[in-house]
């Protein structure tokens, strides 16, 4: 007992208490930041495989992924927007971007882009980058590209007397006629399923006139260019170069191309893998890809695919942008291509041997320099559906080209009535 009645603590206990205080009373551990990501389909499953490297770079950021089926994604996003429950970062189909911009749901990305050294607009194919610019503002960064071009039987083309694929509509017409003469009445030159809009849309965007006029207020389907596209589309069926069937009547497009039921097929990059897997080894040398022919030379195609967007209500925009930059890097895009077969939107990624050395992908690389965005109005998916229905009636002879174009213009003008009303009052729809 010391003076004053207090008891001195043993030295070992004093040291222990000091250590405990140093551990327990020091600076708190950094708070874990959380980023929620929504992605669709196969991409939603694959993205998790890319994240370990991001976690190493940013250990204080937790990434939570929700995978959505494409069939339910659009409605779930709208429901989440209405309930103020949108994710931080999201994969968004390029034709959906105008709709969510109209809802004021997306965060403008121009300032983030200006500060970024990882995302360089000049490295992206111009047509796909442009799909994300609405009213002069950037709302997304392309994640992967989906476009359309020719898959064809080069052996049958050679038998018909042609050494190279077509570069113009006129050349393509001559090839289709020659193939039809070669294969007879039970087979065809090309398959253009009537329940798919892609082919007519590609032919239409190859024209100099836009599909909508007056800043998307009215249809422009009475234009000479659309008449030309629709007329050529109808001619392919009239001359029996294509069977008037839809995709449900073709049990297996890979086998049908393999057996020569048709020699040309317009499709997207996923079919590189499908034809490679499904055709037997002895037929692998018989097929190839080629860019779309155009009215007077190599033609444009659609700039489809998906982009990465940040929702305006996100509380973690800086962290979401870091993840967006990571997923947009050429190295990660290369790995993403290896896992999914999705085509990267950056030119620099295409220097990777997996892409540069892929004979079937080379035509896509050339085509990507000539892709065009579809009209940037929220109503576009409804419009393109109406276009497909009209085209089917023209093919079956229920409407002439002139009647079909006029009917479509009237229908589209009705669809765009609300847009005109809003624009007239200074509201951006």
Task: Annotate each language-model stretch with its function.
Residues 31-42, 61-66, 88-89, 188, ...:
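Short, well-ordered beta-strand elements
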Residues 53-124, 133, 158-160, 164-167, ...:
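Extracytoplasmic "Venus flytrap"/periplasmic binding protein-like
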Residues 269-284, 295-389, 423-429:
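C-terminal lobe and pocket-closing loops
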Residues 94-149, 201, 284-290, 354-359, ...:
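Hinge/lid segment of periplasmic solute-binding proteins
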Residues 79, 87-88, 117-156, 187-189, ...:
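A structural signal for short loop-to-beta-strand junctions that line the ligand-binding cleft
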Residues 42-62, 387, 405:
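Short, polar/charged alpha-helical segment
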Residues 134-143, 148, 173-219, 262:
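Extracytoplasmic/periplasmic solute-binding protein
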Residues 176-178, 215-247, 292:
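Glycine-centered hinge/linker elements that transmit conformational signals in sensory
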């Amino acid at each position: 007992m010391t003076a004053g009645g207090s008891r001195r603590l043993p030295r070992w206990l004093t040291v222990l208490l000091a250590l405990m205080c140093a551990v327990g009373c020091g600076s708190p551990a950094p708070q874990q930041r959380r980023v929620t990501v929504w992605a669709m389909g196969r991409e939603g499953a694959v993205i998790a495989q890319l994240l370990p490297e991001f976690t190493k770079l940013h250990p204080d950021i937790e990434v939570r992924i929700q995978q959505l089926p494409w069939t339910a994604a659009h409605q779930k996003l709208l429901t989440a927007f209405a309930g103020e429950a949108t994710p931080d970062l999201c994969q968004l189909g390029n034709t959906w971007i105008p709709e969510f911009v109209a809802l004021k749901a997306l965060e403008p990305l121009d300032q983030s882009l200006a500060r970024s050294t990882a995302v360089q607009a000049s490295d992206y194919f111009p047509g796909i980058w442009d799909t994300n610019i609405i009213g002069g503002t950037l709302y997304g960064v392309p994640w992967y590209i989906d476009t359309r071009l020719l898959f064809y039987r080069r052996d049958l083309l050679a038998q018909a007397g042609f050494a190279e694929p077509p570069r113009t509509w006129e050349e393509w017409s001559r090839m289709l006629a020659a193939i039809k003469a070669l294969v007879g009445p039970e087979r065809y030159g090309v398959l253009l399923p009537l329940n798919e809009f892609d082919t007519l849309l590609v032919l239409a965007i190859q024209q100099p006139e836009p599909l909508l006029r007056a800043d998307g207020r009215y249809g422009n389907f009475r234009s000479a260019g659309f008449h030309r596209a629709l007329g050529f589309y109808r001619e392919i069926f009239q001359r029996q170069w294509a069977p008037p069937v839809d995709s449900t009547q073709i049990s297996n497009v890979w086998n049908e191309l393999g057996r020569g039921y048709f020699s040309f097929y317009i499709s997207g990059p996923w079919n590189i893998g499908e034809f490679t897997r499904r055709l037997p080894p002895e037929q692998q040398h018989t097929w190839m890809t080629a860019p779309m022919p155009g009215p007077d030379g190599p033609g444009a195609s659609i700039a489809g695919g998906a982009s990465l967007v940040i929702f305006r209500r996100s509380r973690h925009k800086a962290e979401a942008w870091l993840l967006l930059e990571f997923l947009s890097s050429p190295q990660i895009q290369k790995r993403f291509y290896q896992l999914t077969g999705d085509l990267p939107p950056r030119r620099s990624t295409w220097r990777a041997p997996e892409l540069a050395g892929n004979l079937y992908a080379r035509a896509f690389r050339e085509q990507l320099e000539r892709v065009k965005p579809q009209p940037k109005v929220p109503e576009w998916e409804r419009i393109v559906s109406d276009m497909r229905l009209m085209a089917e009636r023209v093919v079956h002879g229920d409407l002439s080209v002139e009647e079909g174009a006029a009917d479509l213009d009237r229908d589209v003008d009705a669809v765009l009535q609300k847009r005109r009303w809003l624009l007239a009052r200074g509201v951006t729809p």
